[in-house]
Amino acid sequence: MKARTDNRADLDPSSWDPALDAVIAAPKHHKVLFENERLRVLEVTLEANDEEPVHHHRWPSVFVFDQVQGPVHDFAPDGTQLPPNRDLIKAIEAWKGQGCLVVNMAPQPLGRVFNASGKTIHGIRVEMKANR
C-alpha cells in the first residue's frame, strides 16, 4: 500500500456529497446525541481492528476522546493510505492516557479510518456548523 499526500483537503466542504456524511454513510460508528442549526454532537466508536465505511466530516470539530490508542490509519476512497492526521498523532503522543484527550479537528474529506490498535476508540465529536 503506497502513501500519498492528501490534496483533497482544500475542496469546499459545502460541496461534499451529503449522502457520504459520517452519520449517513457510517451509522454504526457515528451516533447523533444532539443537533441544532449550530452544532452536532456525535458519539464515535470504532472497535479494535475495525474499519469505518467511506465518509466525510464537513464541519470543523472538537473531538474529546476518552479511549484512543494508535496505530490508526486513514485511507482515501481508492484505498491509498493518507498521511497521519498530525494534530491527532501529536495529541496521542503527548497524552498520558489519563482523563480525556481533546483534539481540534479541521473538516475531513472523504476517506475511511482503520483502527489497527488492540483497543476500542471512543469519544464525543462536537461539530461546529457555519453560522447561518
What are the residue ranges of the model-derived segments?
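A short, N-terminal "cap"/entry segment at the start of jelly-roll beta-barrel domains
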Residues: M1-V44, A48-V54, Q81-L110, F114, ...
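Short, conserved beta-strand element in jelly-roll/cupin
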Residues: H56-V72, A76-D78
